[in-house]
């Protein structure tokens, strides 16, 4: 399982530890990933995703998983999140416009 957020696509980054004497050694900055279960309003079911805590705050701020997935670019989404996005689009398309 890759260390990559399924919604934002954020992965490990590379940088340096810098000592007091300014000696630089390579290090990796890992994303703060959490396995969460989020309710999809359109599908009416729970979805389990591995996301960063920053992405989880975005889901709360934007008003739910559906809104975040519909606005997200397809390139950054994981295959599982992309499949959920397509299911949400199909479900919303079959509902009558009110």
Swiss-Prot record:
What Gene3D superfamilies has UniProt attached to this entry? Answer: Ribosomal protein L28/L24 (2.30.170.40)
- Report the superkingdom from the record: Bacteria
Xref: Pfam families: Ribosomal_L28
Q: Which UniProt keywords are listed?
A: Ribonucleoprotein, Ribosomal protein
InterPro entries for the chain: Ribosomal_bL28 (IPR026569), Ribosomal_bL28/bL31-like_sf (IPR034704), Ribosomal_bL28_bact-type (IPR001383), Ribosomal_bL28_sf (IPR037147)
SUPFAM superfamilies for this protein: L28p-like (SSF143800)
Q: Name one GO cellular component term.
A: cytosolic large ribosomal subunit
Gene Ontology molecular-function annotations: structural constituent of ribosome
- State any GO BP term from the record: translation
The text of the family note is:
Belongs to the bacterial ribosomal protein bL28 family.
Name used for this protein in its record? Large ribosomal subunit protein bL28
Q: Which species is listed as the source? A: Phenylobacterium zucineum (strain HLK1)
């Amino acid at each position: 399982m890759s260390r990559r957020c399924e919604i934002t696509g954020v992965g490990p980054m590379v940088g340096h530890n810098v000592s007091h004497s300014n000696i630089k050694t390579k290090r990796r900055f890992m994303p703060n990933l959490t396995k969460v279960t989020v309710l999809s309003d359109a599908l009416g079911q729970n979805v389990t995703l591995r996301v960063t805590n920053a992405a989880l705050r975005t889901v709360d701020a934007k008003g739910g998983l559906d809104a975040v997935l519909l606005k997200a670019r397809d390139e950054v989404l994981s295959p599982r999140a992309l499949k959920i996005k397509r299911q949400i689009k199909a479900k919303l398309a079959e509902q009558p416009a009110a």
